[in-house]
């Protein structure tokens, strides 16, 4: 909505077909939507062609599809753990590959949505942290390959923000308890609107780094110290949480996780 109000024409792509249609219809500017799974490389290629046929040009691509699971790695369900990597990392690469020809034509901009989890390890979030670290590195490396073509590549960083994924995480009693033991400002859930406005402004500026919460810029500067700090706090928090974590099923969090099913996901 923020981008639409700033004059962007929008192509919305994702799994939640009814939600995509509802949002597209609610926007003030021109918009269309396609139902596709980012982990399906062939479907993303077809969808990219349809988007280009519909709009003629693609100036900006935002790779924002993401899912998460919680729980200790040794108790995690392998397929759910793998799915997080497939969506968050492989899906981002599929998105970039599908739209890269259009971005090369327009000398456009690709934004990879990452997370504080890309450089700050969070216990019980191994798949999410690994996927976001990989997505961050992928985007930085892609920038080096595309700079001489005039294509910009940015990385967006968010911490706990009021989305359906975070609300889903708060329904997991062990994750909720673990979060309550974090220090401020990492323990807080941040409102969506300011984060979205910073992302939209960063897209307009073709920014290399976008921090949805301003304090993440400082955290980025301290990233070398964060693994040791996280380990120190986990030593104290995890002994009380491990027994409960072992009994909680590994499920994808939030509405995005609920939309993840084995049925075919592309109309393209």
Language model segments and positions:
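The beta1-alpha1 cofactor-binding region of Rossmann-like NAD(H)/NADP(H)-dependent oxidoreductases
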Residues: 17, 36-46, 78
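Active-site loop immediately N-terminal to the catalytic Tyr-X3-Lys motif
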Residues: 73-74, 122-126
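Substrate-binding pocket helix/loop in short-chain dehydrogenase/reductase
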Residues: 72-73, 77-82
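Conserved glycine-rich Rossmann-like NAD(P)H-binding loop of the short-chain dehydrogenase/reductase
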Residues: 8-22
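SDR active-site lid
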Residues: 144-214
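Active-site helix of classical SDR
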Residues: 96, 131
